Amino acid sequence: MIFPEEDYVSSAKSMGLTSLAISDFATLRGTPEFVHACKKANIKPIVGVDFLIDELLFTLYVKNENGYKNLLRLFTDYHKGLVTLDNYASYTCDLIVVLSITSPKFKDAFNSDKFNYWLVDVQRGIDNFYLGIAPDKEDYLYHIQVREFAVSHTYKTVAFPFVQYLKKEDAVVLKMVEAVSENKPLAIKELEGSNYLLSNDEMLVHYTEEEIHATNEIADSVDFNLITKRGKLLEYKNDLGMTSDEYLHHLVRLALQKTGFIRRHSYVNRAKYELD
């Protein structure tokens, strides 16, 4: 995302959406802010993470507390290089798995004679499995073929747009960010793209009723609250007569003072956010 999470949630709210998903690549960094923004706007947050496994793009969404634990286990092993196409299904209990059809490896597999057998192996052991359809005018025929295959082989497809910015004209902002990060000049001042937050009417243009229904099916199946206490706070013994919670706050403040970050509001606010 190139805009704050609150902006995405606000736009979704204005469109009448009642649920919204996040899935950053191999990280949960933006998730807490996203969830807080959704709660404030009375929108149901769907928590997920993108993983590239053997050159295939998977998005895993949390169904419940057990699914969250499995996601963290997968997350840990993924960053250790231990997750492969052969074993990833063992992590997916109480997770919703969406396989993107846009990756080159998926397209190559789809064009092979053994695609059906290949996809059976990829999906084996997964209870909640969908093929993610992203709007793509250039690959319109390919999308039709994937949909036809899914119907004939009883796979579920789901509306799965790739959202990077809020409006189509915001594509130029993404180019600006890329140019700055690469220290390159940007000649263009206007640009429209396709990776924006689609309106309800636009969703109906790009997707079937079944694919839109599948998004609601996923949202309805989720019963998870990220913002909750898990386990017990460690007991911090001290000579100041403070409770463990008070002493932890005290130690964090001392650390901020020692490093000089006490003078930077962003660090202080982040510390308060984590402690609360």
Language-model segments: residues:
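Active-site metal-binding loops of divalent metal-dependent hydrolases
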Residues: 25, 49-51, 163
